[in-house]
Amino acid sequence: MSEEFTGPPWAVDCTQDAEKYRLGLPEAARDALWEVLFELRTSHTPYRGENVEPARSTVPRGPHIAYFDGFRGWIRFTFLPRVAEPQIVVEEIFWQ
């Protein structure tokens, strides 16, 4: 393992509640969710993107919201830019 900053693709992990919700989504919504997760995984900076915004404007490096399926759903995630194994943690998923 090197001490250099690694780049994408980032690892993605979900909390247990988010994973349960993901498994209950209809197939079309799950596909849209995978698309946004793929974009986050391969983005050089996951906190920047067309459909990404901070959950709270006062905490720019805190949790962010990424929208999917034409803004019908969103995920709240945090990017942990550790030197060893940086990852994206999906904390909450919502779809309507």
Please report, for each region that a protein language model flagged, where it lies by residue.
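Basic, Lys/Arg-enriched alpha-helical interface segments
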Residues: 1-73, 80-96
